[in-house]
């Protein structure tokens, strides 16, 4: 089934990882729909390339993009939700507009694209692959990125729920990708800064870390793009894929910390059970979870 996947739609494709995904996709023979707010900045020209202007926060724009893609290539087999940006600042430093904008692009944009993709892939009878470019910040919360973290946590919760709703016979798979630092414009021109809050201007502030982060990133976007296409070709792609040593170590630490705190509070967690609670029901729950 996977060998019939021939068309990929990529959001946020004018630079960084998105641009690398366009180049690699064309090199591997895919029909590529490169979506961007500024498609004219995509300098690549190719007979298999369709450049589309897309605002992921606008439902009508998303619907139009999929219609145009289907009209040109007949279907969309792989969708890579890559559009997004980072908003830096302590939570109290954000204004309401900044907070809404971060969620609209990083979460609602992904939700709109995913909903449209699922409908098209299910009705095509071929299935498809959806790759959600999340972040290490979707599992490990980094200071001064609270709204960015929240947007990525939301993407992961949404995606994991959808995975459990899909009929395996539809051949639709979702992979959550959790990169660490990547050699792109994310930490430079693509990063937005909230106005500093005076209460947080002290030695504990993480602003200096983010101000100096660009240039320290580990992951090569071209290598990442190659890997993601390899993942999309698998019959059973992973549900989560961590990219980079930095992301791997931070996620391991968070996983360990969560597990340790969970076990240390077992007595508290179970102390609220009703008086006639049947412990055997826990085993039933475990069995049900294993079958999901």
Curated annotation (Swiss-Prot):
A Pfam family it matches: adh_short
EC number: 1.-.-.-
Keyword tags: Cytoplasm, NADP, Oxidoreductase
InterPro entries the record matches: NAD(P)-bd_dom_sf (IPR036291), Sc_DH/Rdtase_CS (IPR020904), SDR_fam (IPR002347), SDR_oxidoreductase (IPR051911)
GO cellular component: cytosol
Localization (cell): Cytoplasm
Molecular function in Gene Ontology: oxidoreductase activity
Enzyme class, first EC level, given as a word: oxidoreductase
UniProt-annotated catalytic positions: 134 (proton donor), 148 (proton acceptor), 152 (lowers pka of active site tyr)
Family to which this protein belongs: Belongs to the short-chain dehydrogenases/reductases (SDR) family.
Protein name from the UniProt record: Uncharacterized oxidoreductase C162.03
Organism: Schizosaccharomyces pombe (strain 972 / ATCC 24843) (Fission yeast)
């Amino acid at each position: 089934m996977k060998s019939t996947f021939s068309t990929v739609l990529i959001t946020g494709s004018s630079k960084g990882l998105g641009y690398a995904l366009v180049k690699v996709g064309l090199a591997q023979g895919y029909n590529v729909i490169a979506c961007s707010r500024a498609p004219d900045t995509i300098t690549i020209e190719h007979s298999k390339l369709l450049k589309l202007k897309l605002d992921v926060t606008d439902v009508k724009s998303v619907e139009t993009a999929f219609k145009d893609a289907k009209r040109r290539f007949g279907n969309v087999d792989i969708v890579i939700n890559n559009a997004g940006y980072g908003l830096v600042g302590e939570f109290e430093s954000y204004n309401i507009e900044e907070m809404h904008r971060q969620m609209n692009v990083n979460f609602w944009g992904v939700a709109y694209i995913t909903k449209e993709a699922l409908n098209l892939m299910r009705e095509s009878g071929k299935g498809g692959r959806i790759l959600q470019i999340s972040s290490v910040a979707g599992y490990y919360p980094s200071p001064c990125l609270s709204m960015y973290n929240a947007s990525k946590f939301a993407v992961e919760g949404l995606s994991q729920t959808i995975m459990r709703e899909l009929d395996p016979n539809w051949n639709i798979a979702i992979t959550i990708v959790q990169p660490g630092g990547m050699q792109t414009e994310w930490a430079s021109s693509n990063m937005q800064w909230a106005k500093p809050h005076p209460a947080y201007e002290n030695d504990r502030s993480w602003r200096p870390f983010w101000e100096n982060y660009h240039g320290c990133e580990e992951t090569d976007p071209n290598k990442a793009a190659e890997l993601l296409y390899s993942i999309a070709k698998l019959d059973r792609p992973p549900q989560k894929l961590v990219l980079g040593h930095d992301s791997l170590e931070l996620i391991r630490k968070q996983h360990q910390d969560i597990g340790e705190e969970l076990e240390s509070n077992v007595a508290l967690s179970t102390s609220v059970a009703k008086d006639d609670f049947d412990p055997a029901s826990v085993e039933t729950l475990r069995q049900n979870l294993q079958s999901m």
